[in-house]
Amino acid sequence: MSQKTFGQALNEALTIAMEIDETVFIAGEGVGVSIHQDPNMATHGLLKKYGPGRVKDTPVSEAAIAGLAVGASCMGLRP
């Protein structure tokens, strides 16, 4: 069994979920920002691989993030 950081394991899980299901997307504060070059970050490389349509930066607003998630799930997407 290989050893991974928590961020690497989460990145692998997100990658698998996004490969299997095209309705899965990631939204959050700073998830697509280019400053996240550290390979141990959970969202490292996902913006480049899946594009801005599936990796979305959100404002620093929990209400906005919750609204995005509820609206997306009502439309059949999986935030």
Regions found by a protein language model. Name each.
Residues 1-79:
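Thiamine diphosphate
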